[in-house]
């Protein structure tokens, strides 16, 4: 299986990925890909959501993060086209996933390579959240949202523009599950 680290989030026997997994493994059927994921990663369930249009990585860590078994943190898709939002919400409903929105200002980028403004791409440690910031207005609102969701964890802002300009952020470079 071809699988990028940024496109696989595992939480309590469940894996969250985007449909990029199917594109990267065209030589296999969707059913076979799901079977291999379950077997290889020792999963009970594989959840596939549509990747964000024009996101050249197609990774899940630019779209969502697990909060608990039934809830994800979701980059607010307010600036995406209606067909995508419909497909995304339909997928979430089908999988019986709840979601909480977080700021998403990637639409401010002049190109679709930069991940500047993406706040789901953080690293979660036992007692800390290493959180990407970009020196833009939405940073503070996103940090406040994360602090409310993880009140027992120390929030450590990491200036991330240099990493973001190549399309990735903190979680991307860690392959943390």
Set out the residue ranges of the language-model regions:
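Histidine/cysteine-enriched polar flanking segments
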Residues: 1-177
